[in-house]
């Protein structure tokens, strides 16, 4: 019999579970204030849905061996998009949904071993609004919810944003044969491969400039306009940044526009973003999302009618941050109810019930104690802070 959990799966201690629950609760509270309704997408879905129209590699899906091709969800967006386009298709738009749950990813290590990555996610999906307003609401909600989590400023959060069409704009000036290679070079920040490409002097310099082009949205947009002229996407991004910049400054969240940023999943068709925070060891992505019109249209009988975007937080990654732990009730008063030879377990339960009614955490010492001194010695062992002794 195995004595350890499966490689990559999570086994949390009580403190971690408590923190996860509190973080998820904090997020759900703000989702509800913004009018989002909770749904519970299935953990097991058909592979066609889980692959999100080819946006998610089947190798990342943990497959189950049954009659139908199914697997465990590697994320929740595709399942919620399917539900929005079928079960909730008659619901008025905009349709605001949120969900929280465990996701499972499969990956192969260098030695060939298959590892399961299990994590707790919480996020929102917004359906049915065409135009930049959908992105504005989601980015604003993302920033507001981050503030609700009371993450310490030492985490120095950065909201990294891009638009899928910016990469298309960038590669438009390159030859058809080199476009795919240029995309890979920019996405992977590959300086060596630039020198191997057959480019003229101006193209090579432009590519090097673009590879370094990230940071202040205003400066990046200005540079892109100088290279490619006025563009609807750049105009839309300017309007979005003008709206969200004041709140990001208020909460000390740095905004960055990175035209070469490419999300891991290829299901997005508009704005994409990641929320990155520093830990004691390395930066971590605690949230990611974007617009995925094509995915939701795949499930809809009237595809021209449906628009969608969303984001999700990784609760486990947030827990790694320097969160202000005073927001967690980590040391509540815990009362040990112990009884002596003259009392019974029934007396202890009645006493415990009265303490519970007053709001205390109270646990029972199931065996009777010889005397009060004996009971006092058990207080620390039972991880309690106080003794309630009953014997007469």
UniProtKB/Swiss-Prot annotation:
GO molecular function: histidine-tRNA ligase activity
Note: This function is generally fulfilled by the C-terminal part of HisG, which is missing in some bacteria such as this one.
Gene designation: hisZ
Name of the protein this chain belongs to: ATP phosphoribosyltransferase regulatory subunit
Function according to Swiss-Prot or TrEMBL: Required for the first step of histidine biosynthesis. May allow the feedback regulation of ATP phosphoribosyltransferase activity by histidine.
GO biological process: histidyl-tRNA aminoacylation; L-histidine biosynthetic process
Keyword field contains Transmembrane: no
InterPro entries to which the protein is assigned, alphabetical: aa-tRNA-synth_II/BPL/LPL, HisRS-like_core, HisRS/HisZ, HisZ
Keywords on record: Amino-acid biosynthesis, Cytoplasm, Histidine biosynthesis
Main location: cytoplasm
PANTHER family reported in the protein's UniProt record: HISTIDINE--TRNA LIGASE, MITOCHONDRIAL-RELATED (PTHR43707:SF1), HISTIDYL-TRNA SYNTHETASE (PTHR43707)
Family: Belongs to the class-II aminoacyl-tRNA synthetase family. HisZ subfamily.
Subunit structure: Heteromultimer composed of HisG and HisZ subunits.
One cellular component (GO) term of this entry: cytoplasm
């Amino acid at each position: 019999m195995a004595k350890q959990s499966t490689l990559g799966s999570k086994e949390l201690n009580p403190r971690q579970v408590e923190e996860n629950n509190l973080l998820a609760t904090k997020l759900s509270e703000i989702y509800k204030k913004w009018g989002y309704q909770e749904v519970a997408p299935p953990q097991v879905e058909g592979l066609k849905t889980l692959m999100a129209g080819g946006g998610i590699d089947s190798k990342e899906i943990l497959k189950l061996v049954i009659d139908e091709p199914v697997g465990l969800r590697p994320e929740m967006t595709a399942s919620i998009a399917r539900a929005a386009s079928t079960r909730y298709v008659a619901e008025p738009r905009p349709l605001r949904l949120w969900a929280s749950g465990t996701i499972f990813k499969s990956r192969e290590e260098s030695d060939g071993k298959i590892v399961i990555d299990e994590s707790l996610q919480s996020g929102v999906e917004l359906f049915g609004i065409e135009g930049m307003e959908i992105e504005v609401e989601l980015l604003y909600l993302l920033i507001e919810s981050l503030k609700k989590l009371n993450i310490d400023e030492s985490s120095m959060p950065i909201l990294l944003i891009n638009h899928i069409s910016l990469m298309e704009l960038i590669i438009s000036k390159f030859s058809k044969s080199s476009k795919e290679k240029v995309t890979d070079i920019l996405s992977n920040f590959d300086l060596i491969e630039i020198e191997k490409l057959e480019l003229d002097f101006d193209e090579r310099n432009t590519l090097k400039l673009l590879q370094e082009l990230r940071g202040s949205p205003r400066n990046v947009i200005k540079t892109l306009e100088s290279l490619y002229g006025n563009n609807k996407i750049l105009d839309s991004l300017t309007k979005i940044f003008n709206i969200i910049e004041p709140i990001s400054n208020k909460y000390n969240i740095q905004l960055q526009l990175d035209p070469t940023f490419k999300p891991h999943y290829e299901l997005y068709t508009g704005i994409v973003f990641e929320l990155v925070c520093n830990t004691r060891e390395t930066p971590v992505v605690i949230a990611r999302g974007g617009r995925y019109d094509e995915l939701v249209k795949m499930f809809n009988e009237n595809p021209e009618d449906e628009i969608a975007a969303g984001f999700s937080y990784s609760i486990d990654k947030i827990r790694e941050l320097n969160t202000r732990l005073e927001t967690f009730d980590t040391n509540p008063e815990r009362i040990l109810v112990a009884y002596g030879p003259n009392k019974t377990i029934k007396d202890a339960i009645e006493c415990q019930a009265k303490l519970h009614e007053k709001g205390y955490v109270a646990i029972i010492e199931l065996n009777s104690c010889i005397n009060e001194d004996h009971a006092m010695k058990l207080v620390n062992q039972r991880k309690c802070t106080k003794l309630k002794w009953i014997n007469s």
